[in-house]
């Protein structure tokens, strides 16, 4: 099948720091207006999962977490803060093992170290969990953007990831919600 795609253009939208309870769609709308960008049919928004999760109040203060026996043992084994290990246990579907500083987990259908918990994009002493239901988050954001701009759009929630047995980071798509026709070529 011949592709109609001639080019891809990407625009970075600078936003203020997303805080717990912020409305990501309202922020996007304001920043798009400021940048004089009007989304068109078929445009796809790529959002960092840490920003979406933060807006959904998925930021946890570690001091409020009391680790259980399993978290204490696994935290020692994997050299992780036992409070963070407690959150890993609560958030993940399965722990496969680990190495120093990383427990290998399946969380919300993704292979992710430490259940995708992110300390790098959180205030000191806090961590950001993955969105509660990332697919629903992507769908909700997409529907609101489509309603606002009266065209079919896509939303991808992704973030940087480290991968087992690989050096460096990748930027995989974690969750999508598209109403656009796609062709696998």
Residue ranges of model-derived segments:
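Single conserved hydrophobic/aromatic residue that forms the stacking wall/gate
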Residues: 177-185
């Amino acid at each position: 099948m011949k592709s109609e795609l001639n080019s891809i253009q990407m625009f970075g939208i600078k936003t203020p720091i997303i805080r717990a309870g912020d409305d990501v769609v309202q922020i996007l709308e304001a920043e798009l207006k400021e940048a004089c960008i009007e989304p068109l049919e078929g445009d796809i928004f790529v959002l960092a999962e840490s920003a979406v999760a933060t807006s959904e109040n998925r930021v946890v203060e570690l001091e409020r977490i009391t680790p259980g026996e399993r978290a204490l043992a696994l935290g020692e084994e994997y050299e992780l803060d036992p409070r963070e290990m407690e959150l890993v246990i609560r958030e993940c579907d399965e722990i496969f093992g680990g190495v120093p500083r990383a427990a290998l987990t399946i969380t919300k259908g993704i292979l992710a170290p430490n259940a995708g918990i992110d300390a790098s994009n959180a205030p000191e002493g806090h961590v950001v969990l993955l969105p509660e239901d990332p697919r629903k988050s992507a769908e909700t954001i997409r529907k609101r953007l489509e309603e606002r701009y009266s065209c079919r759009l896509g939303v991808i929630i992704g973030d940087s990831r480290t991968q087992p047995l690989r050096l460096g980071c990748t930027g995989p798509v974690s969750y999508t919600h598209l109403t656009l026709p796609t062709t696998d070529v």
